[in-house]
């Protein structure tokens, strides 16, 4: 029985919450108004939301009320968004708050381990008897949190990396009582996610603390996952015991040192890509060179090089850049199928896999694809409605694949991480029009479900756009919010080549207010033109719709890049770096005119 004052059940955030029997221990706080307590502080949490209660849950007026915001006025900007609240207008009127609602609902304080973290879902925490930390999920949570709360982003990053000191890698998961997946890791996206939140204004003291952990995790991959020694990576699972508490989950030998466990390391549990791939018990890996994992590794190299350079470690930075060049060359030599015009996984016997997923586009996010290959890849495959395009995108396996119709988890359904990483690659290769359409489609899918039933789903049906049509799509799962983040990043984002991108040429009219970046709050407005403010001070004004890329300190080229097909005028009042040159699509160079109010570029098309 509940011993603290307060209800044993009630409506919260659109859900009916029932605390059955023992409630959460008194030293865990779940962001409820009253911390619940039990007689035994070691008793597990028992939070249950029944399927019937989910269906009966009413609309939540408080959540809808905070989901929209009025247009920013001069007073808002001069205040510098001191409240720290992320909000939007126009096409982004609801998405920012909805994204942060699901993240906040799933953010917990674990007093035993003295940590704040945003697990994937409170339901999962109940099933796993306390806050469970999954690897790449938590880094994505940090990316979303950083848009409003850099402190919460750091908490998530630090929690995800905490096990490296003991294990030498970030495990697939760590449970509240200490049990962890000792046999496997998960996609190495930590350095990439962290650097995206740090590149604008790096906190060197904090980066110096976590850099050794990122570096050690990086070393894990070629030490343990180059099974055939060809310089490319394969997912795997080591012959280690993984459960310290067998009474919590029944022992099952397939949970380690198996193809199933290797798929869990990929984070793509039942993906058709791995259906018929043998698991090699001697190398502890799948017998498949994986384009996704190898691309993640290249992204990790690039981010670690930037962090090392920032920390005054030029030799280490150079070493990471050489690693990136090497694995990029191997991916292009071994994993590009010239006949099909796509990057593929490759069996160890030399055959290309014909089970294509969005991981085929990850060489774009890594920046290692030659431009002509990137153009062919996007035109022939990504934008092909018979494969990956359509009303609802991006399916987790090609629409041509026989498993697409399964509509089961990674067998055809849409997942936020895939959309986010593909958008990253499109923008990197200046496929700005396609990126804007992907952002709009991601936003439409997200809002379709949010407006319908208040759900932010773990995954979505790629044919109907519905999230709640299957049992294994958690209704309030934090990374469903990545679909909203794709749209937010269409207006403002940090790119891996050291640029701050602002604006869009194709996205619907929208504005974002209070976006946290580099210790400042940013406001971006997009209508007939583009305008940006930082802490209430004007940064730039463009008379026409455009994608504007401002160089950061790490950019190799300090010219402003202006992506537009229209004539216009851009005035930069305040920029991260001094810039008096600009370049248009096609390479035409502009020289700015300096005045007391800034630098102005004018062009005709």
Show the residue positions of the predicted features.
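Low-complexity, Ser/Thr/Pro/Gly-enriched N-terminal "stalk/linker" regions
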Residues: 43-45, 51-57, 63-131, 155, ...
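Substrate-binding groove/exosite segments of carbohydrate-active enzymes
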Residues: 90-195, 199-200, 204-208, 215, ...
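The feature captures the catalytic groove of carbohydrate-active enzymes
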Residues: 38-43, 167, 171-189, 195-199, ...
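C-terminal capping/lid segments that line or modulate ligand- or cofactor-binding pockets
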Residues: 181, 186-200, 336-381, 385, ...
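Alpha-helical scaffold segments in carbohydrate-active enzymes
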Residues: 98, 102, 159, 213-227, ...
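Helix-terminus loop motifs that line ligand-binding clefts
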Residues: 149-242, 332-346, 386-404, 441-473
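Structural helix-adjacent loops and short alpha-helical linkers that scaffold large soluble proteins
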Residues: 92, 145-157, 197-215, 306-326, ...
